[in-house]
Amino acid sequence: MAMAIAMLPALFSSPSILTSRIRCGATANSGGAISSTSSNSDPRRGVPLYKPKSYEVLATDAANSLAFALQDSKSRLEIDFPPLPSSISSYKGSSDDFIDANIQLAVTVVRKLQEKIETRACIVFPDKPEKRRASQRFKAAFDSVDGISIGSLDDIPGTSVTNFFRSIRSTLDFDFEDENEGTWEPKEPPTLYIFINCSTRELSFIEKFVETFASSTPALLFNLELDTLRADLGLLGFPPKDLHYRFLSQFIPVFYIRTREYSKTVAVAPFVLNYNGALFRQYPGPWQVMLKQTDGSFACVAESPTRFTLGETKEELLQVLGLQEEKGSSLEFLRRGYKSATWWEEDVELEASSNWRN
């Protein structure tokens, strides 16, 4: 965790355009709070400004939002925020760095959540080798939290064919028993299952795990970057799009930060304008479009009770910056293209639930 906390400033400090045209339901003040942990703020209102000072604060905000959702009897939940600074992308950085950061953050969120409500959390890994690796590397972290247990998607009862391939994998990976193997087995039924570090192919196994073990128990998808994984659904070798319609659509984002970098060409110097923004949500507050300021903070420019599409997020940022083309013009069409939303944002009528939009 020390590595992640030490590197936090890079996540919220890259250059951006500062604008005075901030329009939002909440009003920012010059000396206002820079995170939502203040006890004086109404959680149902959006934050005017967001800039957590550390990953500890970020985890606290995530745990607070999760606690509100659990108290409202929400059982299918999502938390998604950058586990490492934006200067380290998932392509440039080591995958182990992201895996380890997510484990540390998940444990921290559980610890913070237990300060709010009684929780017996089970962290579910993609497979037994990942579970075993975590038990070896994070033994002290798991021991520091009461009632925490760990499991894997391999715990799902399999067919004879599935069991055969699991035995092959175990042999090839030298998947031998470890002395810590049974240390964090659940002694009582968990009250919350947390799924971390899973890929697109493993989403269908999460669905089976939930059906088998968590049909009436809250389940949390933690930092899976679902928008990235959804893009693979329907492609050859991946689960079908129906997985989103029937399963992923049930998960309500309770704490969500998706940062993006944009650029806009203009006819005058400097000819290219760069700006950064984020789609932001803290349950039970509204969805918010945030514009990055020169001091690294994110200021609210628009909010809605329902989720903004990625295209709408960009349009809100362009509008507040005064860079939006004239509506209906040919230039607007050429810049936006024929479609400005993804298939999972468009196919409302096929969804079993609208929770993921709320």
From Swiss-Prot:
Q: Where is the transit peptide?
A: 1-24
UniProt cross-references to InterPro entries, sorted A to Z: DUF1995, LPA3
What UniProt keywords apply to this chain's record, in alphabetical order? Acetylation, Chloroplast, Plastid, Transit peptide
Q: Highest taxon of the source?
A: Eukaryota
Compartments reported by the entry: Plastid, Chloroplast
Q: Major location, coarse class?
A: plastid
Q: Which residues carry this modification: N-acetylglycine?
A: 25
A single GO cellular-component term on record:
chloroplast
Q: PANTHER family from the entry?
A: PROTEIN LOW PSII ACCUMULATION 3, CHLOROPLASTIC, PROTEIN LPA3
Q: What is this protein called?
A: Protein LPA3
Q: What is the lineage of its organism?
A: Eukaryota, Viridiplantae, Streptophyta, Embryophyta, Tracheophyta
